Amino acid sequence: FIGAILPAIAGLVHGLINR
């Protein structure tokens, strides 16, 4: 479960940082 949402959160955070 966590292994499925982890990449989603990582991608979201990366998108916010690499604005």
Curated annotation (Swiss-Prot):
GO BP, one annotated term: hemolysis in another organism
Subcellular locations according to the entry: Secreted
Keyword Repressor recorded: no
Key words of the record: Amidation, Amphibian defense peptide, Cytolysis, Hemolysis, Secreted
Reported tissue expression: Expressed by the skin glands.
Keyword Secreted: yes
Principal location class: secreted
Coiled coil: none
Taxonomy, superkingdom: Eukaryota
GO cellular component: extracellular region
Chain positions found as Arginine amide: 19
Function: Has hemolytic activity against human erythrocytes. May have antimicrobial activity.
Protein name per its UniProtKB record: Hylin-b1
Species this protein is from: Boana lundii (Brazilian tree frog)
